[in-house]
């Protein structure tokens, strides 16, 4: 079988992986050995195939072994900054939830700088987080035991005697939810420990009282992370796959729906058919015609019509609103957020976007001009009016048990105003002075984009 990783950032530097879904892999779902400054966030790694015939392990041990591993993670190596792993969901994986791969620097000293926070881990088997790194922040994570879980330690920092220097960790704010639903907070010897091997002598302090480095993302409590990660994780735009929705619901409710055919372990499939196989996935194939993006700049025509840019002229590297993000980046950010293209009133079932909240109370946290919004029994009704902009953002807040989450909902309204005005070409030379984008006065303009009195004007 194919024993490659599902996805990875091995050796990467200054890189981010965001909102990905990885499942049914052999070896492990994700690997970033040797990575430097990088981030993995809002990604779901689930159902790594367990007793699946991992070729290398068979060659080394002469037998098939359980190898349903989530991730081996590097970061902050070779003088770089830090590897950041936050707001991810790891579910139904036997081991490596996570496996720390700090490595050694060029002089043989322990390397690696890891910041692991606000992750949710459910139904691991015999291994949660283990391995070694020079400096580790392990904080505000939520580990929920499942029917396959046999390892109680959330963190085993392993000092293996292969290098020089120290390996230490800051541990704080983590929760282990027991199989009976009770919660256990950080306690050395109960939820975390260190291990010595290969003659390693511990002549340093293995635990730090404070984080080694700043976390460059908002750090929530473990309780908040549990609800908020389950509400927004994985490849969930434009729609969430039924597989991912199932895994989220099982994590929320503490259930499983699969059994490994060889191991008999609940929730840990040995092959994809244990989980229904590829035929069970609700994947719909679609194709686009050539008119979807006429100028081939990566921005579809429908979005260019909404923003008032010219779909016949590539503008992917332009910055129409002067915010230092290109027009292409603006489009990608818009479609990466829940979005709706409408011409009339519509409704949204908020349960689909706040899956981590069982009994949430909802409120409108921000409503743009020209849009009316109301919520009843978890159903959001949105009504655009003629004064609405072509692009606007509505904000909805969910609250439950002292925890809250605010999510954006982008609304495209073709009947609204883009703020860019079309004027007939024949009338252009009779009005106020017109300037091109190099701020040169134009008296006989050709079709294109111009400036008049500080506003953009399109002449067609």
Label for each model-derived stretch:
Residues 379-393:
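Extracellular/luminal low-complexity segments enriched in Ser/Thr/Pro
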Residues 402-416:
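C-terminal edge beta-strand
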